[in-house]
């Protein structure tokens, strides 16, 4: 019955206009501007954001032809080169958002320059662990897609479309095992969904929603555990699996497509149950030693490479769950106090943006 309701809701929102869903809408930008003007905390956060945007105006794009992070150990030259290049992603997003806040063309031109540089050079490889780094590039495009010239818009949109198609057509995606059902698939769905909403591509959106239902059934268990937790014996991967699903669920809800947080698969699994299962570990009521019984060689390789947090027996740190809580709180406000307690650094700029996005 729940599946039928969500399908019906999807049929209703499929006709929505090409408005911003991934990035802030014009109405939400207006809310942000009022907060910057009237709210001391928002004004303080904006001061640093504004300074960064100003600094990025003097910088030049540094794209890579292929993003390479997945399966590589710290210190690998390809991974290090990619890490440097990926700094561009936040730059283009910051410039795009600053343009929407100020209306100053210099920020639009620079954001466009960064996006075009990546669109012209980067070749999608269909690896979601690599492509998951493009969140802010997709959001940057969504923010300025109505303001760039048609030629540039087409070039950038074609790059994003190629990225989504590489994910959809990946042979590894089509297997009902391994990376076809683990955290890779969660990140794949998030990327294709974000691109679908940014491009208003209903085929991508429909594909994503259909496979999210399947992923919730295959990857999550009715007791709240996940395939990734059982495979890796690590909360780290339970969280890494939930975060993209939550981000996607928020997008779908924002577009009027139903609540995938509480959606239950035929076997009774749900994102909500898997977040709830995590809560006692976040509160410190339960503890977990990470990676003790992992079945994945890469985890052992990272431990041998002395990468922090990957040694067998490392105690799970509740603060590592912040990426989940910062999103799940918008489905379950009862988590707000826990988030406040855990988030020792206080509200940051991204939390302010998320708050505006979700508080309709």
Predicted regions and their residues:
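Bacterial Sec-dependent N-terminal signal peptides
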Residues: 1-20
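Loop-centered beta-sheet repeat module
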Residues: 174, 178, 182-198, 202
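Short amphipathic alpha-helical face segments that pack within enzyme cores
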Residues: 90, 191, 243-247
